[in-house]
From Swiss-Prot:
Name under which the protein is recorded: Uncharacterized family 31 glucosidase C30D11.01c
CDD domains (alphabetical): GH31_MGAM_SI_GAA, GH31_N
Keyword Glycoprotein: yes
Coiled-coil blocks: none
Entry's EC annotation: 3.2.1.-
GO biological process: one example: polysaccharide catabolic process
Organism: Schizosaccharomyces pombe (strain 972 / ATCC 24843)
Length: 993
């Protein structure tokens, strides 16, 4: 939730939220179903006395802009005179290299004080991974690798199966010290610092690697971004609750990239390919400069903790497996999380949820989960429930009804804890604040007092998730939230998961702004909020049909008038001076380091939209050194707390802020996107990227979060979302309602897409299990499956689900056709999902595909066997329905596939099934291993690409009579009686002649 670009120089802003209710929207969209609009118009109506109202609160004068900084990125001269280092006292071993690095000349004081001596420690961790650590000799710089209590991963431990058969060479020169890493298999240089002096200062570290021409790099993400990164781009890693620019720093930090290289074979216009990976492990602020001939790392603290993965000359998926296995494979999510989820900021009462559920059910739109934003809280305070808007008895009845229908409820949980007003008697019962002080678990100021920022409740304090005592505190908070909802069962939570929002963490002011102002609490944040009279939403998607509707005219006039009012009151920022110098050296500064990061905030102050760098964490660790890990730490603690409360139920967590390895604990959504076609397009790139980064369960707010969607965009996005891992419709308070039943065409598109998604649940779940075992992405770019086809390197508007399905969505308004590529050479066979016909295509050529509204082009790749189930209204119903198999033969008449089955919810599965399926020109074999009893039978088998009709078909030796053959498609039906004990209760074989 949050955030628009706030201009704090004006008293209040107008662009956060709040334009329409369903009734007003129904009059503005000519294509809206009248019956739908009138039937559902009451869903957002609430009693004025039952919901929290900001309007009477005081707006305190607090610092919001900070001190204006000029990003250092745009300076070019600093560091050019730095001498680099020389290697001394070198010791080479079978497992690595140790050396002392000595400054090779006078200190240059680029953006800090140079260390005269460094320690080089090169460790050959595995056959595929080398770790280069460069630290100051006295070990005074912060090292994340020394804080295993905060962040731990397999990459810190040498593999017990290490054979010593290295797939790489580490080479170096001594004067100046420079190193390069080469993959032995093809002699490709993977990382190369030659010709680039190392700079290592107390607040500035610079390391540069040379790059090949027109390199293909992917990763380096914080949230939304393009897929293939350009070579004139800077990525800033500084977790913040706000960003308004593509590629800018945002919620998280993942300083890992994968490079895919194409090596031409003679003059034949064909290529081999190879990939490798690079991780610069750091929780400090960082910029990565991608330029035409190099990639440059600039860090404002810590050390160099560089991991290079030799990757693969076969497929990039092996490179990603190496990386993800080293940081920790993603957690296995519960089966229900693959269902469609419905959410918004604006379900203010229990009645809103009940009505919304009823309308979805009446519209026959399968819905798995129902989510609340902060509306359910009492005065937006964490671990509380507004008992007027959500009466405990009725709320528990609602939860029981969900449970009986095998549906789920997920509330949002913000980390910021309301700072109780000492003069308000009602605040004295707010346990999360007082018990947190008793447990001493809040982030502190340098003087030891509590750091008091600002969030939705007013002035707030922040739990320190690195404090060992915070686990019990957080666990108790979750239990108390359960009780506040009316539950009498401490260890049987009424909610199925938690949505971890605002966990960078976000603050609406600079510094500990509320330390001396708690007697004013609760206070109004220093900008206009949902429900304020001047807070309307006027934006619509690109190419929105601006007809003569009253809505659009009034929106346009109001938007222009408010823009003019804001523009005239805009004030220029204070002109910053250069950093302070002491004896010619940059002054050490935590809040305003000499190297100013290019953050996407108004002043580039590091504390804007976050907790200040000089705040203190457990063990007197500066937040400056752990800045990018807060969301990771909250996910870890929340996972452990839920696991402690319900030990055998998989925790489901959805986190906005993520760091390296967050996938071990949480899924991720891309944050506060916009209801724009461009945001729908970029969501594909971001989801593909996070699958490379070890967080496969990821999705965007379908139909958009900020701004108003429209019918066409929402129909297209609901259809697209069904083919991405995490599928949730969510938008902001003040924007028009966008539940899929609001428009007839959106409802139809949703039903069609969800029907396909739910039929594919066995396939999706198997992909999820594979990801949790070895890190293989669930959704993949095309070049992952076709790594030698160079034209696919930049394709990011089509994608693969696993190895078998190619998804080609419509991503532009006012179109019924799309252009797309069908990958692979002319021997690669693709079948149309809907009619099973062979798709004709030429190598490396786009084809035109029909794409009417509500339709997504799906191609099935020959060589795959896809397990399916008859879709139901919920994932529970679906997984208890009969199975079927879709077998798509390749050019040689072969196909294979797999299926993983467990109970879908247990943390430790006592029994499961692994099924291997293979087919050739006249036989299908099913080999089952495992002890789980799975009762659904097998209903039918469809075989595509069978050249000749069969005369006789046998299922485990028993002749079949129910089959049809047409256009190279064989359909075997009425198999239920042959598999009454379960489709995969035992091995079986189908043969034909």
């Amino acid at each position: 939730m949050l955030l628009f670009k706030f201009n704090f120089t004006t008293a209040f802003l107008f662009t956060i939220l709040a334009f329409a209710q369903a009734r007003s929207h129904s009059s503005s969209s000519s294509s809206t179903s009248k019956s739908s609009a009138s039937h559902h118009s009451s869903i957002n109506s609430t009693s004025a006395t039952s919901v929290y109202d900001f309007s009477s609160l005081t707006t305190p004068i607090v610092p919001t802009n900070g001190v204006a900084q000029e990003p250092t990125l745009y300076e070019s001269s600093r560091g050019l005179s730095c001498p680099g280092y020389q290697a001394r006292n070198i010791s080479e071993y079978s497992y690595g290299v140790l050396a002392i690095l000595e400054l090779a000349g006078d200190a240059c004081y680029a953006y800090g004080t140079d260390y005269p001596y460094l320690l080089l420690n090169v460790s050959y961790d595995t056959e595929e991974r080398v770790h280069i650590s460069i630290s100051d000799l006295n070990q005074t710089q912060f090292q994340l690798s020394n804080r295993r209590d905060v962040w731990d991963a397999p990459l810190f431990y040498r593999s017990s199966n290490f054979s010593g058969n290295l797939q790489y060479n580490f080479s170096f020169n001594t004067d100046p010290f420079e190193f390069w890493i080469t993959r032995i298999a093809d002699d490709q240089v993977l990382f190369d610092t030659r010709g680039n002096p190392l700079i290592f200062e107390d607040q500035y570290i610079e390391l540069t690697t040379n790059m090949v021409e027109d390199y293909n790099v992917y990763g380096l993400s914080g949230s939304q971004q393009s897929f293939r990164l350009g070579n004139n781009l800077t990525k800033t890693f500084w977790a913040t609750g706000y960003s308004d620019s593509p590629e800018a720093n945002m919620y998280g930090s993942h300083p890992f990239y994968m490079e895919q290289r194409y090596i031409p074979i003679g003059t034949t216009n064909t290529y081999t390919s190879a990939s490798h990976g690079v991780l610069m492990l750091s929780s400090n602020g960082m910029e990565v400069l991608l330029r035409s001939t190099y990639i440059k790392y600039r860090m404002i603290g810590g050390i160099i903790d560089l991991f290079v993965y030799s990757g693969s000359t076969v497929s990039p998926k092996y490179t990603i497996q190496q990386y993800v296995q080293s940081i920790g494979t993603p957690t296995m999510q519960p089966y229900w999380s693959l269902g469609f989820q419905m959410s918004r900021w604006g379900y203010k009462t229990l009645s809103d949820l009940i009505n919304m559920r009823s309308y979805l059910n009446a519209s026959n739109i399968p819905t798995e989960g129902f989510w609340n934003d902060i509306d359910y809280m009492s005065e937006f305070r964490t671990f509380t429930v507004n008992s007027t808007a959500f009466p405990p008895n009725q709320t528990l009845d609602f939860f029981r009804s969900l449970d009986e229908s095998h549906q789920h409820y997920v509330p949002v949980l913000d980390p910021a804890i309301y700072a109780a007003n000492p003069n308000k008697s009602a605040d004295r019962t707010y346990y999360p604040y007082y018990s947190g002080f008793e447990d001493n678990i809040f982030i502190k100021n340098p003087n030891g007092s509590a750091y008091v920022g600002m969030a939705w409740p007013g002035f707030v304090v922040y739990p320190d998730f690195t404090n060992p005592a915070v686990l019990q505190y957080w666990k108790q908070g979750i239990l108390n939230l359960s009780t506040a909802f009316g539950s009498n069962y401490s260890y049987d939570l009424p909610f199925s998961g938690l949505c971890l929002d605002m966990n960078e963490p976000t603050s609406f002011c600079i510094g500990s702004c509320g330390s001396d102002l708690l007697k004013l609490n609760p206070v109004h944040p220093p900008f206009s909020l949902p429900g304020d009279v001047d807070n309307k939403v006027y934006s619509y998607p690109e190419d929105f049909n601006a007809t003569n509707t009253t809505e659009y005219k009034s929106v346009s006039r109001a938007s222009q008038s408010q823009y003019k009012a804001t523009a005239t009151s805009e004030k220029s920022h204070e002109t910053p001076s250069s950093e302070s110098l002491i004896n010619g050296k940059p002054e050490f500064s935590i809040n305003y380091p000499p190297y100013a990061l290019d953050t996407d905030t108004e002043t580039h102050d590091l504390a804007q939209f976050g907790v200040s760098p000089n705040a203190t964490m457990h063990g007197n660790t500066l937040r400056y050194n752990l800045f990018n890990t807060y969301g990771y730490s909250e996910s870890k603690i929340s996972f452990e707390a839920l696991n402690s409360i319900q030990p055998n139920i998989r925790p489901f967590l959805l986190s906005r802020s993520t760091f390296v390895g967050s996938g071990r604990y949480a899924a991720h959504w891309l944050g506060d996107n916009k209801s724009q076609w461009s945001d729908m397009v970029s969501s594909i790139s971001s989801i593909l990227t996070f699958n490379l980064l070890g967080i496969p369960m990821v999705g965007a707010d379908v139909c958009g979060y900020n701004g108003n969607t429209d019918e066409e965009l929402c129909a297209r996005w609901m259809a697209l979302g069904a083919f991405l891992p995490f599928y949730r419709n969510h938008n902001s308070l003040g924007s028009i309602p966008q539940e899929p039943f609001r428009w007839a065409s959106v409802a139809e598109a949703s039903r069609s897409a969800i029907e396909i998604r739910y039929s594919l649940l066995p396939y999706w779940y198997t992909l999820m299990h594979t990801a949790s075992v070895d890190g293989t992405p669930m959704v993949r770019p095309l070049f992952f499956e076709f790594p030698k086809q160079i034209s696919l390197a930049s394709v990011d508007k089509q994608f693969m689900i696993g190895t078998a399905l190619l998804i080609s969505p419509a991503l532009e308004p006012n179109t019924t056709y799309i252009q797309g590529i069908i990958p692979g050479d002319n021997d690669t066979i693709w079948y149309d999902w809907y009619n099973h016909s062979v798709i004709n295509h030429d190598y490396d050529e786009n084809i035109t595909m029909s794409a009417p509204l509500g339709y997504v082009n799906i191609a099935v790749r020959g060589g795959n066997i896809i397990p399916l189930q008859q879709p139901g209204y919920t994932t529970y119903e679906s997984r208890n329905n009969p199975y079927s198999l879709l077998i798509a033969m390749d050019n040689n008449g072969f196909a294979s596939g797999s299926l993983y089955i467990d109970d879908g919810i247990s943390m430790q599965t006592n029994s499961s099934l692994s099924v291997k399926l293979n087919s050739n020109s006249n036989t299908i074999t099913c080999v089952v291993s495992g002890t789980m009893v799975s009762s659904p039978s097998l209903a039918n088998i469809t075989i595509l690409g069978l050249s000749n009709p069969p005369n006789t078909i046998l299922f485990n030796g028993q002749q079949l009579s129910d089959y049809q053959y047409s256009d190279q498609t064989l359909s075997l039906t009425n198999l239920l009686d042959l598999t009454v004990d379960g489709a995969f209760s035992k091995n079986w074989t189908v043969t034909w002649s």
